[in-house]
């Protein structure tokens, strides 16, 4: 029995796909691994809030010696519901201009729970080819009919809708707003227009990599494209730009009530710690005031994207602070990431099955606490690699 697993691991090593948990020490925007201190080019802390000491101290000052509980000790449907949860949900619903919001323990919990709760045998789920693994897992758990449309190919999506609009009672179209591996953005206005032509269609959008970063108030790509009110299921996470933990859905009250009664990861999980939810509440209140951080991040991102195009003469799909350098070959990608780490940059290889075969890459993630000079030095390092 054990030999089977040993052989599977040996195969992963032979394919340069073997993963190990790293031993890291975090020092602000830097990572220390063994004796090597590196600029962290792989973080999801897009606004730099997780390392913002002034923000942290302001939070503690607000609560002083009345800090929220460190654990909920139960699911929300039993004894694990605290006032701060309702306060955050109300704050978010008001900010988004929607009826309600609902919190979850993580983005993964949200994506594996919402779709199975909403779907049944009379439902068809249609997903962009490159949606996140958590959404794929949620679709599998839904046990309903499922097809994919080609990435960003909304003509292909409409063909699928035309073919199936009289066969199913409801069709759920699923996409990310900012895609996690390429950093490219969905055209949500096109998706909304399609939804409006097909009354049985619901639109499910995951804003994990857009919340905090995009939009005038930092509410994501849906805010930036002016279509928050037209998206039925608007999902996002607190564990990236907001420097916290957990996730949310913005939706109508009837959807919230349905999820509270039907969503298994919500019903059967211990709720987030109240302390964590209080921190998220505090950070979310700051989002409208972080325009300077968003502008700085956008400037850094544009500069790095253009540099990669110029240096390596490769196409650049990204429109965000997620900047891929696609090498293709697994071994070459691993070697290049190691060379960058030796030069003082914590860059990680992304390989199949996380990305499609033949598209192994290094995904650079920029954060708003990086300095222009640091990104300039990194670009100079990339230039040396190319020579």
Swiss-Prot record:
The keyword Ion transport does not apply. Substrate binds at residues 19, 132, 354. Pfam families: Aminotran_1_2 (PF00155). Its cofactor is pyridoxal 5'-phosphate. It catalyses: 6-carboxyhexanoyl-[ACP] + L-alanine + H(+) = (8S)-8-amino-7-oxononanoate + holo-[ACP] + CO2. The keyword rRNA-binding does not apply. Keywords: Biotin biosynthesis, Pyridoxal phosphate, Transferase. Its EC number is 2.3.1.47. Gene3D superfamilies: Aspartate Aminotransferase, domain 1, Type I PLP-dependent aspartate aminotransferase-like (Major domain). It comes from the Bacteria. Pathway: Cofactor biosynthesis; biotin biosynthesis. Pyridoxal 5'-phosphate binds at residues 107-108, 180, 206-209, 237-240. GO terms for molecular function: 8-amino-7-oxononanoate synthase activity; pyridoxal phosphate binding. One of its GO terms (biological process) is biotin biosynthetic process. Belongs to the class-II pyridoxal-phosphate-dependent aminotransferase family. BioF subfamily. Catalyzes the decarboxylative condensation of pimeloyl-[acyl-carrier protein] and L-alanine to produce 8-amino-7-oxononanoate (AON), [acyl-carrier protein], and carbon dioxide. NCBIfam families: bioF. Homodimer. This is Putative 8-amino-7-oxononanoate synthase.
């Amino acid at each position: 029995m054990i030999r089977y697993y040993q052989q599977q691991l040996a195969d992963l090593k032979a394919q340069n796909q073997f993963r190990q948990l790293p031993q890291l020490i975090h020092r602000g925007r830097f990572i220390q691994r063994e004796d090597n201190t590196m600029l962290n080019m792989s973080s999801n802390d897009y606004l730099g809030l997780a390392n913002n000491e002034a923000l942290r101290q302001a939070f503690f000052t607000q609560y002083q010696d009345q800090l929220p509980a460190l654990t909920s000790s139960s699911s929300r449907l039993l004894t694990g519901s605290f006032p701060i949860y309702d306060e955050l949900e109300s704050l978010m619903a008001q900010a988004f201009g929607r009826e309600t919001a609902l919190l979850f323990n993580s983005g993964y919990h949200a994506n594996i729970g919402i779709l199975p709760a909403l779907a049944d045998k009379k439902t068809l789920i249609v997903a962009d080819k490159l949606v996140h693994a958590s959404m794929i897992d949620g679709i599998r758990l839904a046990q309903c009919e499922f097809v994919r449309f080609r990435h960003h190919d909304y003509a292909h999506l409409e063909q699928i809708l035309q073919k199936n609009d009289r066969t199913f009672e409801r069709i759920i179209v699923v996409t990310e707003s900012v895609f996690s591996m390429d950093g490219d953005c969905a055209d949500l206005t096109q998706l909304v227009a399609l939804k409006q032509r097909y009354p049985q269609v619901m639109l499910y959008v995951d804003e994990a990599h857009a919340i905090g970063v995009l939009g005038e108030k930092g509410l994501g790509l849906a805010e930036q494209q002016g279509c928050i009110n037209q998206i039925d299921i608007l999902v996002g996470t607190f564990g990236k730009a907001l420097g916290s933990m957990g996730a949310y859905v913005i939706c109508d009250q009837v959807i919230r009530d349905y999820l509270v009664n039907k969503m298994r990861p919500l019903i059967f999980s211990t709720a987030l710690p109240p302390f964590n939810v209080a921190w998220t509440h505090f950070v979310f209140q700051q989002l409208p005031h972080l325009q300077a951080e968003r502008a700085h991040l956008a400037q850094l991102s544009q500069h790095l994207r253009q540099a990669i195009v110029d240096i390596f003469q490769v196409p650049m799909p990204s429109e965000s602070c997620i900047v891929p350098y696609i090498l293709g070959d697994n071994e070459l990608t691993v070697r290049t990431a190691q060379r960058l780490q030796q030069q003082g940059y914590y860059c990680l290889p992304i390989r199949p099955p996380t990305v499609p075969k033949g598209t192994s890459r290094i995904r650079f993630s920029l954060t708003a606490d990086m300095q222009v000079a640091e990104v300039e030095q990194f670009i100079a390092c990339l230039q040396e690699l190319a020579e």
